[in-house]
Amino acid sequence: MSSNPFNPFEAALNWQRKTLENMTDAAETSQVADERLELMESVDVGQTPSNVVYEENKLELLHYDAEAAGIEVPDEEKEDVPILIVYALINRPYILDLQEERSVVRRLLEAGHDVYLIDWNEPSRLDQHLTLDDYVNRYMDNCVDVVRDRSGQDAINILGYCMGGTMSVMYTALHKEKVNTLGLMAAGLCFDHTGGVLEEWGSEEYYSPQDVVDTFGNVPADMLDIGFALMDPVENYVTKYIRFAENMENEGFVENFGRMEQWLGDGIDVAGEAYVQFLEDVYQDNKLYKNELELDGKHVDLDNIDMPVLQLMGEYDHLIPPEASKPFNDVIASDDTRTIEFSTGHIGLSVSSSTHADLWPEVAEWYSERSTGSEEVDIEVESPEAAEDDAVDQSELTDIDVDATDDVDADATEDDATDEPADVDSVSGIGPTYAERLHDAGIHSVADLAEYDAADLADIAETTESRAQDWLDQL
C-alpha cells in the first residue's frame, strides 16, 4: 500500500495553481501577440543587392552585386566562370536569399563566385500556351547567352533548383557546349514509383493535368499551395502554429517564421501548357529518365550530359525524395558525378542553419574546383537601348505574350529611327539566340527578315514555323 495516499485537498490546490500559471502565461503571451504579428509583417526577404541585366516577357535575369552586399573577396579568389541559378516555375526565388545568414546566394558570393539567377515571375493569361520548349530552348538559352557574353566564358556553371533543376537537365542535354558544370538541388528526375506522395497524387490514374488547364488556363497558385500543404497536413496546419505559440516571445524565431510564411503564401501561377507537359512527360511517363523526352521534336539526349554533375538531396524531402534523384547519375554519360544527401527536408536545403554551415561551403568548393575558366569569347547578344545599369532592355516584351502578333509600336519605331536599319532582335520574340542564328545566315535587319517565308526562317533559326510566322506578322 502506498505511504502517500491520495489527498483530494492537495490535488485541488495543485490544479488551481497550474490553472493560474497557465492563465498567467496566456495573458503574457497575449500582451506580445500584436507586437509579434507586426514584426512578422515587417520582415524583409531577398535583400542581397542585384541588378536586372536582361528581361524577356515576364522573366528577369538578376546579377548579384557582392560589393554592394558588403562581401569582400580578394581578386585571386574570384572565380571566372559564373553560376546561373535556374529557379522553379513555382513560388518566388527569394527562398534562396531569405535572410543574410540563410542565403544560398550569399554563400556562393562569399566563396568568390559570380552569381546570376532567373526570376521567372508570374505568367499572364496570355502566357498559358508557353511550352517547356519555350522555357528551355528560348528563355533559358537566351539567359545563358547573356551570362556567357557578360563573363566572356564559352561555358558557364548551372545550379537548378527543384523544377528548375529538371529543366536544367533538359537544357544541358540540348546545349552541352554552353554548360561547364551542372548542379541539381532537389530535382525530380526519376519517377518509377520513387517520387513519393507527389508522384502518387500526380498519377494518370487519379489526376489529369489537362483537365486543370482546360478549366483555369494557367494552374492557380492557390491550388498548388494547398496541394503541397496537404502532403504533410499535421505539420502545415497544426504543429508549426503550436511551435509559433510556444516561441512567440523569441523575436528571432518570430522573424524567421514570418519570412517562411511570407514565402509560402507568395505562390505564382504556372503556365498551363508547360505544366501539362511536365506532369505528363516527366511524372506520369518518366520520359526524361528513360531518355525518351523530346522538346519540339528535339531529343533530350542524356548521353550528352558528360560534364561534372552534382546532386543535392534532402534526406527527409517529402516533395522530391532522394530516390527520385539518385538513379539519374546512372543514366548520364558523365564520369564525374557526386551526390550529397543532407539530413534535412526540401526547403531545409535552402534555409536550415546546418546546411549553411556545412553543405553550401562544400558546394561552393565543388564549383571552384571545376571552374578553371576559358579564353574570352565574343557572343553576339544584341538588344534595344541599354538601360543605365547596363541591362539588356527588352521592357517592351514584359507585358506581351511571346506569341503575340501585335505590330511593333509605331511611336517607338519613329523615336529609335536612325540611318541604320532595325536589327532583327527588335522584333518581339527574337532574343539573342535566334538573332545569332539569323545573323549567321546573313539575316541582319528587319528588311532582310521580310524577304524570307516562315518555313525557311524556322529552319534557319531552329524553331517552329508558327513562331517564325509570328515574327513576320509584326513586320
From Swiss-Prot:
It comes from Haloarcula marismortui (strain ATCC 43049 / DSM 3752 / JCM 8966 / VKM B-1809). It comes from the Archaea. The active site is at C162, D317, H346. Its EC number is 2.3.1.-. Residues 82-348 form the AB hydrolase-1 domain. Pfam families: Abhydrolase_1, HHH_5. Pathway: Biopolymer metabolism; poly-(R)-3-hydroxybutanoate biosynthesis. Residues 375-423 have a biased composition (Acidic residues). PHB and PHBV are desirable bioplastic due to their biodegradability, biocompatibility, and mechanical properties. However, PHBV has better mechanical properties than PHB. The keyword Oxidoreductase does not apply. This is Poly(3-hydroxyalkanoate) polymerase subunit PhaC. Keywords: Acyltransferase, PHA biosynthesis, PHB biosynthesis, Transferase. Belongs to the PHA/PHB synthase family. One of its GO terms (biological process) is poly(3-hydroxyalkanoate) biosynthetic process. Residues 369-431 are annotated as: Disordered. Heterodimer with PhaE. Involved in the production of polyhydroxyalkonic acids (PHAs), which are water-insoluble biopolymers used as intracellular energy reserve material when cells grow under conditions of nutrient limitation. PHAs are composed primarily of 3-hydroxybutyric acid (3HB) and 3-hydroxyvaleric acid (3HV). Required for the production of poly-beta-hydroxybutyrate (PHB) and poly(beta-hydroxybutyrate-co-beta-hydroxyvalerate) (PHBV). One of its GO terms (molecular function) is nucleotide binding. It is an enzyme of class 2 (transferase).
